[in-house]
Amino acid sequence: MLVTGVDLIEIDRINQAVSRWGQRFARRVWTEAEWLRCRDSAQSLAARWAAKEAAAKALGVGLKGIGHPACAVAWREIEVANDTQGKPLLRLHGAAQQRANELGIRHWSVSLSHSGDQAIAFVVGMG
């Protein structure tokens, strides 16, 4: 089984949401580790947002608070971490991991990028 997802977001949308809602918004979307690593970079936060959206698309589910209430996972159940060389990697928790198990997906690859006013993420899941 092979699943893919991609998402593109305007960095300013994330910057505005963080400015307006602060920690309340951050705690809903990013894990503590993600926030500590990226809180000073709207570009990095936006890229991780895009990765969460892309992963949800690959899993065939929505994210809580954005439609699909019957089959949604929480934002923090999809985590973007980094290996020792800084390469992004995907960690799933809770309902997101359960859905990956249902699909037979055991390995993930994630690519993040940003340029100008946009950030993009591409996610591939393999059985």
Curated annotation (Swiss-Prot):
Gene3D superfamilies on file: 4'-phosphopantetheinyl transferase domain
Q: Where does Mg(2+) bind?
A: D7, E53
What does it do? Transfers the 4'-phosphopantetheine moiety from coenzyme A to a Ser of acyl-carrier-protein.
- Keywords linked to the UniProt accession: Cytoplasm, Fatty acid biosynthesis, Fatty acid metabolism, Lipid biosynthesis, Lipid metabolism, Magnesium, Metal-binding, Transferase
Q: Which reaction does it catalyse?
A: apo-[ACP] + CoA = holo-[ACP] + adenosine 3',5'-bisphosphate + H(+)
InterPro entries this protein is in? 4-PPantetheinyl_Trfase_dom, 4-PPantetheinyl_Trfase_dom_sf, ACPS, Ppantetheine-prot_Trfase_dom
Q: Per the annotation, which location comes first and is thus the protein's main one?
A: cytoplasm
Q: Where in the cell is it found?
A: Cytoplasm
Is-annotated flag, keyword Lipid biosynthesis? Answer: yes
A single GO BP term for this record reads: fatty acid biosynthetic process
- A single Gene Ontology molecular function, please? magnesium ion binding
EC numbers for this chain: 2.7.8.7
**Which cofactors, by name?**
Mg(2+)
Q: Which GO terms describe its cellular component?
A: cytoplasm
Q: Which family does it belong to?
A: Belongs to the P-Pant transferase superfamily. AcpS family.
Enzyme class, top EC level, equals transferase
Q: Write down what this protein is called.
A: Holo-[acyl-carrier-protein] synthase
Statement: the UniProt record of this protein carries the keyword Ligase: no
